């Protein structure tokens, strides 16, 4: 029983299919599987994990699902071709015309676009609330509200959500509580244990951990995942077996990587707070963070994500980034290498400027995904780049 094993052991062993005695799950680069009588019966009965066709399931996707469920403490799950495919399937699979959702005003840019541009076309309306104030979520609930949507940490301003308080509100009003746990990974927080119904991941990020795949995952109860399975099949956002293999490989080192990501980010945040070229430093480990107390309760191990505001605005921030030699200017996060971006010209490019500013993405705002390099090399790189502004 994997639930009896400790987290690090689950990251290595859960889900691995030792076919033909292989230490790792072999890559089954096949679009289809032999349709035996047993599999045909399972398919006809609607069994979601029957190996028939790789858009439905594959050996490699099943191995990943089992591991993620073991790490999140979930009953079941599905794998997707991207994080947005996972989020879209949850929204369109569990909501219908006339339903209402309450979500965070500073939700991830891709999710914001889905909620403001696509869902209304299907008659699904979204009210944006303040993730830092659970009472604002409760105040936004309507008679037709079906779901509360939250993120463990907001992107990119790193607000910490009081997941337990949100779970209390969701339970009180009999609503689904859906959370994007990408920014902390299962190593950093356990939303299902705190009362969430569905946990979403962009597996591109910390779970994959090497910036070499794009993927998504949804885990939760057997009943909810069973509702989502036919939607996944209909929408077609299935992952490739080779990408699944790389994801499983990446997850095996999750418990080794995450402590370094987090300790590096905490140390650099502490030093940036004292740097004369930095206006504001944002990291949940800092006592100056407005959600410090909540963070210590919800995600005490921290995160490898870091944000700060460079004095001089966006032009100064861009000059700083272009002078970096180790930290790589690129979108995404959660890989072993450090990545940096200005949200105004990347993740939040298509969010109106007043909305960005209200969410805390002010001129000079920089987001960094701190990798597992030596912290002193990272700090020297940051220092020399700031010195050249």
Enumerate the language-model features and the residues they cover.
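A common structural junction motif
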Residues: 236, 324-332, 385-389
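Glycine-rich beta-alpha junction loops
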Residues: 16, 29-35, 205, 253, ...
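Conserved N-terminal alpha-helix of the aminotransferase class I/II PLP-enzyme fold
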Residues: 35-85, 110-117
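Conserved C-terminal alpha-helix-loop-beta "cap" of PLP-dependent enzymes
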Residues: 278-366, 370
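N-terminal "arm"/small-domain region of PLP-dependent enzymes with the aminotransferase-like
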Residues: 1-58, 66
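Conserved PLP-enzyme active-site core in the AAT-like
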Residues: 2-3, 8-17, 76-277, 282, ...
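PLP-dependent enzyme catalytic core of the Aspartate aminotransferase-like
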Residues: 5, 10, 116-117, 125, ...
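Acidic-histidine catalytic/liganding microenvironments
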Residues: 71, 272-276, 324
